[in-house]
Amino acid sequence: MKKIIFLLAIVLGAIAITSCSDNDSYDKQLKRGRKSINKFIVKHGINVISEAQFEKQGNKTDVSKNQYVLLNNSGVYMQIVNEGTGEKLKNGETATVLCRFDETNVQGDTLMLSNRNLRWDGIVDKMLVTRTSGTFTASFDKSSSLMALTYKSESVPKGWLVPLPYIKLGRITSATDQLAHVRLIVPSAQGQSFASKEVLACAYDITFQRGV
């Protein structure tokens, strides 16, 4: 219980620095969110490429150039650090996917949540993912997900599903295997419940592994 209270205090504290007054219009909050994303991109030297260029590069981003592709339908910026080992999720298939992640408040550029630190390294966020006619849906296992524990929701942020058409889901079976690894900048509309409510953009560093 103390861990949960401590965790919620950290998350709420991070969100508080970007909370808007009741007098703020939603449009103003959206503009603030876009401005914070642009500042984050400049600060971190991110090279934004178009979807057309991304496709020409074989649906890959050049990490050495710090490339992120802007996916227009979602507004999510994505960098594929590693495509991963194994196979992509097939149409009609449902799979358990295990995730390690860092969640960063874009406006404050501060870490909000992570299951990679010592306090929470015993929790690997588990989600059940289904692909149907090219569309991905997913839900967290509330008994084994820090995101679900923190935000009181089994809903997986839409932004987390954006990389799934481009990555392989597998398990490490040899020294040369690598998990799928992506970095995302997720606008509030594609984010978790608090981010959506507070009109808060978040950045994520996530690895994806196929569960058993």
Predicted regions and their residues:
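Cross-family detector of peptidyl-prolyl cis-trans isomerase
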Residues: 20-212
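Repetitive helical segments and hydrophobic/amphipathic motifs
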Residues: 11-12
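Bacterial N-terminal signal peptides that target proteins for export
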Residues: 1-7
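C-terminal motif of bacterial Sec signal peptides marking the signal peptidase cleavage site
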Residues: 15-19
